[in-house]
Curated annotation (Swiss-Prot):
It catalyses: (6R)-5,10-methylene-5,6,7,8-tetrahydrofolate + glycine + H2O = (6S)-5,6,7,8-tetrahydrofolate + L-serine. It holds the Pfam family SHMT. It is found in: Cytoplasm. This is Serine hydroxymethyltransferase. Catalyzes the reversible interconversion of serine and glycine with tetrahydrofolate (THF) serving as the one-carbon carrier. This reaction serves as the major source of one-carbon groups required for the biosynthesis of purines, thymidylate, methionine, and other important biomolecules. Also exhibits THF-independent aldolase activity toward beta-hydroxyamino acids, producing glycine and aldehydes, via a retro-aldol mechanism. It comes from the Bacteria. Its EC number is 2.1.2.1. The keyword Iron does not apply. It is an enzyme of class 2 (transferase).
Length: 417
């Protein structure tokens, strides 16, 4: 059973993996939270490291046979510390949500008050949504954006002093603006609250120095290792607060507080992604992510589409389709017919349900990682406009689909299809 070949042993799964690979290779991916990992990361994640249980931390495991595992985790931590210029790192969280849970569990007690960004205004489920642990275990309130589509800091300050949360949460999953981390920390200090920031979406831009870094102001920062960082799907907790008690609480909250054994094949892959992010070309990658995003917004505005806040300062932006008389769900499904993948997304004060939405979210990390040139990004953006202006024109959609496929062949992800 050990030395089996996937194709021969389980052809059903093998065929589906091949189909998914072909799908990824032949579609343009504009989902802001997705990216492509390197072949080195794929190799690490498919390695024998997946076999090893390693409960505990370096030098203090609950299983024998972890001497090599310790070295791998040590490398991951060392690289993360260098990348983020921090003194505390925990590379064990399985995901961003797990990382966030661990931070909450370390710094809060059940029913403590938290204040995070409204999910419908660009926040994340784990920032206080009532359908998530963060809104069930804790008493959550939310701040949002103003009429200009930017964070309403006056409301944030008012709500902070009104409810006096134990923690203020910064970060987002669908917000295209710049966050004033310094001012948010000032508000937190005024009410003696923790300031916790989730940089999952903007982590790559931050380490490249082209988006404000919250580490100087936040007590704790969490992130995923995919998205703009371009690594494996996983979580990370970092801090420069200098409080050893907080560091100890965070470690205990990850293990044994919320997880058992770490995923060592993923931690090895994280280490590789940190090495990749330390290379000079990573800065150019992030620079293009921002440049492509801004360029696309300009085209959408020129084509009379409504962009939330009218601009972007990161890798993503939201298109308000209310005036186009098409829902986000319909738009994303129609664009998929043309081999263009986006996701439906709620917009501030959306009249539609989260399952339908009035908007779509567009992001540039994957097309930049793939190496697609700005010339084709401009064409793709205009094609999106053409399709959304004539969603029932199946002939046009079919023609665009063929053009997209040609571009995909020109820019393969891993190899020729």
């Amino acid at each position: 059973m050990i030395n089996t070949n996937l194709k021969n042993y389980d052809p059903k799964i093998w065929k589906l993996i091949i189909k998914e690979k072909k799908r990824q290779e032949s579609y343009i991916n504009l989902i802001a939270s997705e990216n492509y990992v390197s072949s080195s990361i794929l190799e690490a994640q498919g390695s024998c490291l997946t076999n090893k249980y390693a409960e505990g931390y370096i030098g203090n495991r609950f299983y024998n046979g972890c001497n090599i595992i310790d070295k791998i985790e040590k490398i991951a931590i060392k690289r993360a510390k260098k990348l983020f210029n921090v003194e505390y790192v925990n590379v064990q969280p399985h995901s961003g949500s797990q990382a966030n849970f661990s931070v909450f569990n370390a710094l809060l007690k059940p029913n403590d008050i938290i204040l995070g960004m409204n999910l419908n205004h660009g926040g994340h489920l784990t920032h206080g949504s009532t359908v998530n642990f963060s809104g069930k275990l804790y008493k959550s309130f939310s701040y949002g954006v103003n009429k200009c589509g930017e964070i309403d800091y006056d409301a944030l300050k008012y709500l902070s002093h009104l409810h006096r949360p134990k923690m203020i949460i910064g970060g987002f999953s669908a917000y295209s603006g710049i966050c004033d981390w310094k001012y948010m920390r000032k508000i937190a200090d005024e009410i003696n609250a923790y300031f916790f920031v989730d940089i999952s979406h903007i982590v790559g831009l931050i380490v490249a120095g082209i988006y404000p870094n919250p580490l100087k102001y936040a007590h704790v920062v969490s992130t995923t290792t995919h998205k703009t960082l371009g690594g494996p799907r996983g979580g990370l907790i970092i801090s420069n607060c200098g409080n050893k008690k907080i560091y100890s609480k965070l470690d205990s909250s990850v293990f044994p507080g919320s997880q058992g054994g770490p995923l060592m094949h993923v931690i090895a892959a994280k280490a590789i992604s940190f090495k990749e992010a330390l290379e000079p070309k990573f800065f150019l990658l992030q620079k293009n992510i921002l440049f492509f995003s801004k360029k696309m917004v300009k085209i959408f505005l020129k084509r009379n589409f409504s962009v939330i806040s009218g601009k972007t300062n990161n890798h993503l932006f939201l298109i308000d389709l209310s005036e186009k008389k098409i829902s986000g769900k319909e738009a994303s499904n129609i664009l998929a017919l043309a081999r263009i993948i986006v996701n439906k997304n709620t917009i501030p004060n959306d009249s539609q349900s989260p399952y339908i939405t009035s908007g779509i979210r567009i992001g540039t990390p994957a097309i930049v990682k793939r190496g697609i040139s700005i010339k084709y990004v401009i064409k793709i953006t205009n094609w999106i406009c053409d399709i959304l202006n004539e969603p029932n024109n199946l002939i046009k959609i079919k023609k665009i689909s063929k053009k997209i496929k040609k571009i995909c062949y020109k820019y393969p992800i891993y190899n020729k299809i």
